[in-house]
Amino acid sequence: MKILKPYMRNTSISCYLCFLLNSHFLTEAGIHVFILGCVSVGLPKTEANWIDVRYDLEKIESLIQSIHIDTTLYTDSDFHPSCKVTAMNCFLLELQVILHEYSNMTLNETVRNVLYLANSTLSSNKNVAESGCKECEELEEKTFTEFLQSFIRIVQMFINTS
């Protein structure tokens, strides 16, 4: 099971930047550009994370064909685009229930990967206050299959807006 490290995707840019600025390191501006270039390598790249989350959710969908999961989870099936961060946080909280209730190793690894990728991508939006959104406990309880289908739809919404 691999957990992607999206913050290490553009390391070659810093090498090119080093060669480009090699003759300009003695100037203050050259040093600032070099430092900013090095810092930018460590910044998270979120474009592909939602695609990876969707891939893992589809993998979970295929896994549950062979595993009997008889649980109901709070599911936001008709989320409003202005409440997508709140809805995503609810989906992630509910997904943790699967980790506690089921012991299938492949399923749990994939769920952990979804949680890691989604939380790292959402980290900048975690504290966004969205008014008029339902609390997780106010949502309707649905089967795990319906939960996954709604989860994939909201992830697709994040993909389309990024």
UniProtKB/Swiss-Prot annotation:
One of its GO terms (cellular component) is cytosol. Its main location: secreted. GO terms for biological process: cell maturation; extrathymic T cell selection; immune response; interleukin-15-mediated signaling pathway; lymph node development; macrophage differentiation; natural killer cell differentiation; natural killer cell proliferation. It is found in: Secreted. Keywords: Cytokine, Disulfide bond, Glycoprotein, Secreted, Signal. Disulfide bonds join 83-133, 90-136. Residues 30-48 form a propeptide. Belongs to the IL-15/IL-21 family. This is Interleukin-15. It comes from Mus musculus.
